[in-house]
């Protein structure tokens, strides 16, 4: 897990991701991490691995990468102490919001493509959030408009 102690980043041997959703964007994340593994490791300084994938259709995941473990219960991701970051790419408000809350309460960092999260949830609905919890917003349109990696 990435930790900051007085401005110094400490990285684990690898960063483990729990991926929620395997549609167009989620499938793209699987392919980018698989196809550019060496470059990502070089730039980040440690490997980034998808440890588990939450998917309604396991066959989609296995078509992209047969080695990825597929789960159907969010608790298998939020309860896994080895998962550092939960990447939410479900594509609909529900159950994405509930899953993100569970992940944050379990001490995971969350990356989501739901830019309008605050509008969906209302002003006070994230009052349970602690100062140590992190939500990062990813505008997935950017990924399609510009290359992530130069060859």
Spell out what each predicted region is.
Residues 2-105:
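N-terminal glycine-/serine-/threonine-rich beta1-alpha1-beta2 phosphate-ribose binding loop
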Residues 86, 110-111:
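Hydrophobic residues within beta-strands of alpha/beta enzymes
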Residues 18-21, 111-112, 137:
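Short glycine-rich or small-residue beta-strand-to-loop segments that form or flank ligand, phosphate
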Residues 90, 95-106, 113-151:
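Rossmann-fold NAD(P)-binding glycine/threonine-rich loop
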């Amino acid at each position: 897990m990435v930790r900051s102690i007085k401005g110094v980043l400490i990285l684990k041997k690898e960063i483990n991701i729990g991926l929620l959703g395997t549609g167009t964007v989620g499938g793209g994340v699987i392919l980018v991490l698989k196809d550019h593994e060496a470059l990502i490791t070089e730039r980040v300084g440690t490997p980034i691995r998808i440890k588990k994938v939450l998917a309604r259709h396991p066959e989609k995941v296995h078509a992209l990468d047969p080695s990825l473990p597929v789960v159907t219960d969010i608790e298998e991701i939020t309860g896994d102490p080895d998962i550092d970051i939960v990447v939410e790419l479900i594509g609909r408000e529900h159950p994405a919001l509930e899953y993100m809350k569970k992940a944050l309460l379990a001490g995971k960092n969350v990356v989501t493509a739901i830019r309008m999260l605050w509008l969906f949830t209302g002003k006070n609905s994230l009052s349970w959030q602690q100062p140590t919890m992190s939500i990062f917003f990813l505008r997935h349109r950017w990924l399609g408009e510009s290359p992530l990696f130069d060859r």
